[in-house]
């Protein structure tokens, strides 16, 4: 899909075809709970600020919440503009466009996009925001997929076998690698912190999408219990 100079909102399927860096403008705690894999978090509000603005929306009015949001954001404008420029330089070369999303594709992403456009950055918004992305993720698990499971006792080198058979016709999903957990015997000893179940699902969904785009014929993965540590297998 060619990237036109536009500030329109895109459905998930079209948004993912674009190549610009992805910016998640939600609060840090929202981002940690789950995000589009590869997205960069540039929060418009901190967790505390978001709570306060949400409270004014519920107890006072939408207009009051907007005023409070502007009052919070305006002093940070210079810092946000610098972060926007840094984000456009993360990939090789200079990207003059950004993909942006918030929770529902509302005022946070639109306000951030406006800031980016003031310094000549083209913006592409995700229609429906992260909420629509999560719907896309969960839909990936509803499909009838040609899954093959590898079973065996601990230490029988099942992961090595998966790595060996991985080729263009067979798509391998390393559940233990994604979950940062080696199963019941070794757990997460010596591994990085586990992702949330939500983020675990997001990463698997992206892998399933690669299965389709690469025209593979089978999906191979290691047979696991319903959970890998704190990650629940969808």
Short names for language-model regions:
Residues 16-92:
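Positively charged, proline/Ser/Thr-rich regional signature most characteristic
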Residues 22, 39-41, 123-125, 147-149, ...:
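Conserved beta-strand scaffold positions in the cores of enzyme catalytic domains, especially
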Residues 67-126:
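Catalytic cysteine-centered active loop of the rhodanese-like fold, especially the PTP/DSP P-loop
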Residues 167-234:
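Conserved nucleotide-sensing/catalytic segment adjacent to the nucleotide-binding pocket
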Residues 106-109, 146-167:
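Glycine-rich phosphate-binding P-loop
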Residues 49-55, 133-137, 182-188:
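Short, charged, surface-exposed secondary-structure boundary motifs
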Residues 99, 121-134, 174-179:
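A short glycine-rich beta-strand->turn/loop micro-motif centered on a GG-aromatic cluster
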Residues 1-37, 138-142, 147-151:
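Flexible, polar/low-complexity N-terminal or interdomain linker segments that lie immediately upstream
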């Amino acid at each position: 899909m060619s990237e036109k100079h536009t500030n329109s909102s895109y459905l998930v399927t079209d948004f993912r075809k674009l190549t610009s860096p992805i910016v998640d403008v939600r609060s840090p705690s929202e981002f940690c709970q789950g995000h589009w894999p590869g997205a960069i978090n540039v929060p418009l509000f901190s967790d505390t600020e978001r709570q306060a603005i949400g409270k004014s929306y519920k107890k006072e009015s939408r207009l009051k919440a907007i005023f409070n949001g502007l009052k919070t954001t305006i002093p940070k404008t210079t810092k946000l503009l610098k972060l926007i420029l840094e984000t456009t330089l993360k990939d090789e070369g200079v990207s003059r466009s950004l993909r942006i999303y918030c929770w529902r594709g509302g005022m946070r992403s639109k306000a951030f996009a406006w800031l980016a456009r003031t310094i000549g950055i083209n913006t592409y918004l995700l229609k429906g925001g992260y909420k629509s992305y999560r719907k896309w993720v969960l839909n990936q698990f509803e499909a009838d997929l040609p899954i093959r499971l590898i079973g065996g006792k601990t230490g029988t080198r099942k992961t090595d076998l998966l790595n060996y058979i991985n080729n263009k016709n067979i798509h391998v999903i390393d559940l233990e690698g994604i979950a940062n957990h080696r199963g019941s015997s070794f757990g997460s000893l010596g591994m990085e912190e586990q992702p949330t179940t939500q983020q675990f699902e997001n990463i698997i969904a992206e892998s399933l999408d690669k299965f389709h785009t690469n025209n593979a014929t089978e999906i191979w993965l290691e047979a696991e219990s319903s959970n890998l540590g704190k990650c629940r297998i969808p």
